[in-house]
Regions:
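Phosphate-binding site recognition
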Residues: 1-151
Length: 151
């Protein structure tokens, strides 16, 4: 991510507020609304579970050892966490073990698959919904005001 090209968003203040209050923040929203871009801006490291490189090696690693993909400089971005639901519990456990604020940002679908998640994350993982900004430019297209939908 080229931080110099990042255009500040209204939601940035909320992300910073939540990171200062919780061990992790889960940013949810529709495709192309800027979840990954916004989260990467607020992160110091990250792993992209949906990256097809190496036959989806990041996803495979997350399935084999969820705790291993959490290693890295914090705040750490876990993009598309819902592709490996046990990552949620791994984040919750890590936040319990190291009670620091702003350790992780998880990004994912508005309607994640909760199958395989054992704990709600209450008090540890704050949920934040993001939506398209009217008139915002998304990669490859322009979003018209009437295209904006609330999550």
């Amino acid at each position: 991510m080229d931080r110099q090209n990042y255009r500040p968003r209204i939601i940035d203040r909320k992300v910073e507020e939540y990171l200062s209050a919780f061990g992790a923040v889960c940013i949810e929203g529709p495709k192309w609304c800027g979840k990954t871009w916004t989260s990467a801006y607020h992160s110091k490291s990250g792993i992209y579970i949906g990256d097809p490189a190496g036959n989806f090696q990041n996803r495979q690693l997350a399935q084999l050892s969820p705790a291993l993909v959490l290693e890295g400089e914090t705040t750490r971005l876990i993009d598309e966490w819902q592709e490996v639901p046990p990552l949620w519990d791994a984040v919750r456990y890590q936040v319990d073990q190291t009670p620091k604020k702003g350790q992780f940002i998880l990004t994912g679908s508005v309607t994640p698959n909760h199958k395989g998640i054992l704990h709600s994350g209450a008090g540890r993982i704050a949920r934040l919904r993001i939506m398209h900004r009217p008139g915002e430019i998304a990669p490859g297209r322009r979003i018209r005001t009437n295209d904006a939908k609330k999550c």
